[in-house]
From Swiss-Prot:
It is a multi-pass membrane protein. Its main location: membrane. This carrier protein is part of the Na(+)-dependent, binding-protein-independent glutamate-aspartate transport system. Homotrimer. This is Proton/sodium-glutamate symport protein. GO terms for molecular function: symporter activity.
Length: 421
């Protein structure tokens, strides 16, 4: 009998979670029994993310060993991220203006959700200016950054350490071998943890549906439909078009990442798939030096799905309150989002925090966020899947742009996937 693939196992877990959550809607015991299972799975993934990023980056950077090359890669990567996320904001604004998801919605029929925790987080984040964000990329204490899980300082330290390993030549070989062994061991651990993914997905979805139910979607169904349709458009038209420019088939990327996309969608967490997408992009022909730098950095600077949603949600709230947003005000919103949406990965409820930091500056009532907080998890699932595709594509594009993409390895990997399908 043929073994059921991981994608199908996760999908079955997703469906069963929805069924259990719907049957026991409003029953707090669902969270009591299932939340620990979901939390254990998320903790297992978070446990391995930092060791994989550090070991992969050190090995990748040490193999390049050239500060000038790395600086060139970093510059190109940031430019690419800025262009794509700006396009995502524009697409979100256009979708909100064309489909008007907030027009005609009766605010009295909507439930308000407490957003105080997001407000507190936003107040903390707003104390940091853009300059401070860049200053904080350089860690004053790497162990403090490791404890907090601050990805950008960890990436900076790993790059510098990798350059140091390369610079000392023969003396650095034992260190390099240690990190190579660490990376391989952690990828093995990742594969073992992924066997637990269907159970984690079942638990997390079961808890979500039991808390919010399907009824919470009905008053805001137009917003949900517009968000999902716009995300699909962005994947196949925008990212698909960019991929085609570089000779990449977007459907190949989706096929490669099918397991990870279902998992990221179900858990609404990009972190759960970071190790696997790095591994798969290497198998697809991207060098370790590029995947280990571009993908983790993209988690802070290239959240395409999140930035698209933030623009759309901002206009939705304005429409909800009957506020007319002229072009000049929408351009201001675009410029503010270009800044506020960068560099705060790892902050809980990052999209909400960005929106809270943005709405007030363009004259939109932040209280409106309380109306969509209840369905944020459903919307978060869609934007997470888009973030995963966007960052995976970025790694391939940077590899091609740098002339380091292994075309033959990529073709062999696709052929191998087609045979096993």
């Amino acid at each position: 009998m043929r073994k059921i693939g991981l994608a199908w196992q996760i999908f079955i877990g997703l469906i069963l979670g929805i069924i259990v959550g719907a049957i026991f809607y409003g029953n707090p015991k669902v969270a009591t029994y299932l939340q620990p299972i979901g939390d254990i799975f998320l903790r297992l993934i978070k446990m391995i993310v930092i060791p994989i990023v550090i070991s992969s980056l050190v090995v990748g950077v040490a193999s390049v060993g050239d500060l000038k090359k790395l600086g060139k890669l970093g510059g190109k990567t940031i430019i690419y991220f800025e262009i794509i996320t700006t396009i995502a904001i524009v697409v979100g604004l256009l979708a909100a203006n064309i489909f008007q998801p907030g027009t005609g919605v009766n605010m009295k029929s909507l439930e308000k959700t407490d957003i105080q925790s997001y407000v507190d987080t936003t107040n903390e984040v707003q104390h940091h200016s853009m300059v401070e964000t860049f200053v904080n990329i350089v860690p004053k204490n790497i162990f403090e950054s490791l404890t907090k899980g601050d990805m950008l300082p960890i990436i900076f330290f790993s790059v510098m350490f990798g350059l140091g390993v390369a610079a000392i030549g023969e003396k650095g070989k034992p260190v390099l071998q240690f990190f190579q062994g660490t990376a391989e061991a952690m990828f093995y651990v990742t594969n073992q943890i992924m066997k637990f993914a269907p159970f984690g997905v079942f638990a997390l979805i079961g808890v979500t549906v039991s808390k919010f139910g399907v009824e919470s979607l009905i008053p805001l169904s137009k917003l949900v439909i517009v968000v999902y349709a716009t995300m699909v458009f962005f994947i196949f038209v925008v990212l698909g078009g960019v991929a085609k420019l570089f000779g990449i088939n977007i459907f190949h990327i989706i096929k490669i990442l099918k397991d990870e996309l279902i998992l990221a969608y179900s858990t609404a967490s990009s972190e759960t798939v970071l190790p696997k997408i790095m591994e798969k992009m290497e198998n697809f022909g991207c060098p370790k030096a590029i995947t280990s730098f571009v993908i983790p950095t993209g988690y802070s600077f290239n959240l395409d799905g999140s930035t698209l949603y933030q623009a759309l949600a901002a206009i939705f709230i304005a429409q909800l309150y009957g506020i007319d947003m002229p072009i000049s005000q929408q351009i201001s919103l675009l410029l503010v989002l270009m800044v506020t949406s960068k560099g705060i990965a790892g902050v809980p409820g990052v999209s909400f925090v960005v929106l809270l930091a943005t709405l007030g500056t363009v004259g939109i009532p932040i209280e409106g966020l309380a109306f969509i907080a209840g369905i944020d998890r459903i919307l978060d699932m869609a934007r997470t899947a888009v973030n995963v595709i966007g960052n995976s594509l970025a790694a391939i594009i940077m590899s091609k742009w740098e002339g380091q993409y292994n075309e033959e390895k990529g073709k062999q990997y696709i052929a191998q996937l087609q045979q096993s399908a």
